[in-house]
Regions:
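Charged, solvent-exposed interaction patches on well-folded alpha/beta domains
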Residues: 2-174
Length: 174
């Protein structure tokens, strides 16, 4: 009688240990979504897009959501952006938080990705390379106290941005 009880106690102890280890090593699932960087469409049909090109159709947008618009009226099939639209959303997603409220839209022009500010000023990025440096150069140009108006900032060479025109007032500082 003692041997079967000892075996049963050992099995129970091993089962308890196994369950304790299983509980401690089991990881909980976590949904990680990219932050919204732009919108597709307008009004109640607008859909958010993450900085990685993921369509965030489930994310509710309110009238207060101030995301820049991409030049599409509806999301593409497949749930992700590709090509020049993906390049645009990568540029928008890399924008510093202080500049995001000023971003109106993006399009792919002759020089590559262009971002238009709400004031009408155009930021010409070219491709989606060196985004941190290009956004720093854009912020520095927009904060330059010697400027009161301009039309564009060419950021192809972020170390030497080209500034042109005088048709649009600079946005107020954040």
């Amino acid at each position: 009688v003692k041997r079967p009880l000892a075996i049963l106690a050992a099995v129970a102890a091993l089962a308890t240990l196994y369950l304790a280890l299983l509980r401690d090593t089991t990881s909980a699932g976590e949904l990680v979504t990219p932050p919204p960087a732009a919108t597709i469409g307008s009004g109640p049909d607008a859909v958010a897009v993450g900085a990685d090109g993921t369509i965030l159709a489930w994310l509710p947008l309110t009238e207060d959501t101030a995301l820049p618009a991409l030049p599409l009226s509806s999301p593409p099939e497949g749930g992700r952006l590709a090509g020049t639209l993906l390049e645009q959303v990568r540029v928008l997603g890399a924008a510093p938080a202080a500049l995001q409220p000023y971003l109106a839209s993006s399009y792919y022009g002759e020089s590559g990705v262009d971002v238009e500010l709400r004031s009408g000023i155009e930021l010409r990025f070219g491709d989606a390379s060196r985004l941190a440096a290009k956004w720093r150069a854009a912020a520095a140009a927009l904060a330059d106290p010697s400027l009161s108006a301009l039309d564009y900032v060419d950021l192809h060479a972020p170390g030497h941005p080209a500034i042109g025109g005088s048709g649009h007032e600079l946005p107020p500082p954040p």
